[in-house]
Amino acid sequence: MTRRRRSRPLTRDEVIDAALGIVDAAGLEALTMRRLAADLGVEAMSLYYHVPSKDVLLDWTVDRMRTELRLPDDVPGDWADSLEAVFMEYRRVLTAHPNMLPLAARRTGTEGMSGLEFLIEQGLPVEDAVDLYQSLVGFTVGYALLGSAAIEAVWSGLPPALGDRLREWRDDTFRRTLRTLLDGYRHRERGA
C-alpha cells in the first residue's frame, strides 16, 4: 500500500488534533504513534520532530481537550461560585470526550497548579485548598463517567421515561452535590 504524501509541512497542532480525534473515535488504546502517523500521512519517526515522546503527546492531548472549556469572564459571587461554573463546564467537556476520562483523571497538567493557586489566593489554607481541589477533580471525573457511552448503553435499555429521569437525576445531583461541597469549604473558610 502506498502512503499518501503530505503537500505541506506537519504542525504540532495537527498532531495533537489528530491524536485527540483518534482517542475520541477509537479509544485511548488505539492511539499509537504508528496509527497517528498513518492518519497524518507521515512516517512514524517524523512525529518525533514535533512530539518528544508519546507521554508528552498524551499530556498535550489532555491540554487540547481542556481548551474546549468555555469559562465566563466574570462570575458574580465569590470563589465558590466561580469554581461551580468551572467544574460544571469541566464535566461538560469530559462528557464530550469520554475516551479521555482515564487520561484526564491522571494528568492534571498546569490547570492543577493554577486551581490550587486560585484557592490559596482566595484565603483557603494550603491543606484545605489541596483537599478541595482534589475532591472537585475526582468528583467531576466520576460524574463524567456516569455520562459515558457505557452507562448510556445500559440506560437505553430502560423504559424511556426512566432513562430520561436518570439523566436528569445525574445532572441535578451533580450540581447539588458540587454546591454542597463548595458550600462546606466556604463555611470552613468563613469560620476560620
Spans of model-derived segments:
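A contiguous pocket-lining binding segment that forms or flanks enzyme active sites
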Residues: M113-L145
